[in-house]
């Protein structure tokens, strides 16, 4: 059986073998008598005290392939465990940073879209567009023009041909017959009278058009009479 103390290749071989060991006194507390290599035997192996647990080669592969077999101990185990935990934390931190970057980019795009919507200039014609349907951009909510059917227009023209001014009772009757409101009937007759006045003024400018002036005077008297009658009934 060869050993470091019986190998002739060693230049520092001595008979006692104590000089190979560190230069420490035998009675020193730092010197471990169990690790004295001059004696061998089963009794010494049984009484030998290990300061660190024994690890199998499998543990060496799992927890640290870069470590030598002499570097393993309780501290090495905890260091490997800390390295695994730090790697997991770094990967989780990287994923969190990527998700935060995506959220920030989506919020930035959303903010840019809102700024573009807010920077659109609204013109007056855009405010009046589709205001009767409540889809206009501005606060100017104006009523749209009432579109009358051909039947309604024909009946109103017949009534205007006989009576240019209507009493309130007659307005209610026509409104019920034509499925219109009293206000719509009143507005239609006002617009129709304005149109009739324009036509009469054009005819009065022509020679022999004195009758139009008399008709306009009579119209003014009838309009005043209609207004006074409507106020008295209301």
Swiss-Prot record:
Its main location: nucleus. One of its GO terms (molecular function) is DNA-binding transcription factor activity, RNA polymerase II-specific. One of its GO terms (biological process) is regulation of transcription by RNA polymerase II. Residues 88-116, 199-234 are annotated as: Disordered. A motif (Antp-type hexapeptide) lies at residues 122-127. Residues 141-200 bind DNA. PROSITE patterns: ANTENNAPEDIA (PS00032), HOMEOBOX_1 (PS00027), HOMEOBOX_2 (PS50071). It comes from the Eukaryota. InterPro entries: Antp_homeobox, HD, HD_metazoa, Homeobox_Antennapedia_CS, Homeobox_CS, Homeodomain-like_sf. Sequence-specific transcription factor which is part of a developmental regulatory system that provides cells with specific positional identities on the anterior-posterior axis. Belongs to the Antp homeobox family. This is Homeobox protein Hox-C6. It comes from Xenopus laevis.
């Amino acid at each position: 059986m060869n050993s470091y103390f019986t190998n002739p290749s060693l230049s520092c071989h001595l008979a006692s073998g104590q000089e190979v060991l560190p230069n420490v006194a035998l009675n020193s507390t730092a010197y471990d008598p169990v690790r004295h290599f001059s004696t061998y035997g089963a009794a010494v192996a049984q009484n030998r005290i290990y300061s660190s647990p024994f690890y199998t080669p499998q543990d060496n592969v799992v927890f640290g392939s870069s470590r030598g077999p002499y570097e393993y101990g309780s501290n090495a185990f905890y260091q490997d465990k800390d390295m695994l935990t730090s790697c997991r934390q770094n990967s989780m931190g990287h994923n969190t940073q990527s998700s935060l970057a995506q959220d920030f980019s989506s919020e930035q795009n959303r903010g840019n879209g809102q700024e573009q919507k807010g920077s659109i200039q609204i013109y007056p014609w855009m405010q009046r567009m589709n205001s009767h349907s409540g889809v206009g951009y501005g606060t100017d909510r104006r009523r749209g023009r009432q579109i009358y059917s051909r039947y309604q227009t024909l009946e109103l023209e017949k009534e205007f041909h006989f009576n240019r001014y209507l009493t309130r009772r007659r307005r209610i009757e026509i409104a019920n017959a034509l499925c219109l409101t009293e206000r719509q009937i009143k507005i239609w007759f006002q617009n129709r009278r304005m149109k009739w006045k324009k036509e009469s003024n054009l005819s009065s400018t022509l020679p022999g058009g004195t009758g139009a002036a008399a008709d306009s005077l009579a119209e003014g008297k009838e309009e005043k009479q209609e207004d006074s009658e409507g106020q008295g009934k209301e």
